[in-house]
UniProtKB/Swiss-Prot annotation:
Its EC number is 4.1.1.50. Belongs to the prokaryotic AdoMetDC family. Type 1 subfamily. The active site is at 63 (schiff-base intermediate with substrate), 68 (proton acceptor), 83 (proton donor). This is S-adenosylmethionine decarboxylase proenzyme. One of its GO terms (biological process) is spermidine biosynthetic process. The gene is speH.
Length: 129
């Protein structure tokens, strides 16, 4: 069965703390990562937190790239999700890891839209009151 998309989740450790706290740098890296992967950038939104950290999203025609950075830990959580068979999300994720000088990169790729989740893998959450 064909997928509706590929979702790369990347845990980046040992990143350059100054880069992780530089919103303009991260924004440019993410736009460049999308373009290198062959994606079409639609919108860009990033936010710098006080005293540190950056979160942001690059919306692409094919889906999105996101980051949440934790400079105090040298850590960044990134997602690259692409719809369709043309764009390889790993190209963007690897570029981001290199630009942030990550010493460790743990990557998980999930095919999306493959049908119902198997019961043993489904998580149930009750409503919070």
């Amino acid at each position: 069965m064909d997928t509706m998309g590929r979702h790369v989740i990347s845990e980046l450790w040992g990143c350059d703390t100054n880069k992780l706290n530089n919103m303009e740098f991260i924004e440019q890296v993410f736009v460049n990562a999308a373009l290198r992967a062959g994606a079409e950038v639609r919108e860009v939104a990033f936010h710098k937190f006080a005293p540190q950290g950056v979160s942001g999203v690059v919306i692409i025609s094919e889906s999105h790239l996101t980051i949440h950075s934790f400079p105090e830990h040298g850590y960044a959580s990134i997602d690259v999700y692409t719809c369709g068979p043309v764009i390889d999300p790993n190209v963007a994720a690897e570029f981001i890891a290199r630009e942030l000088n990550a010493t460790t990169s743990e990557v998980l790729e999930l095919p999306r839209g493959m049908g119902p989740v198997k019961p043993e893998k489904r998580l149930s959450h009750s409503a919070v009151k």
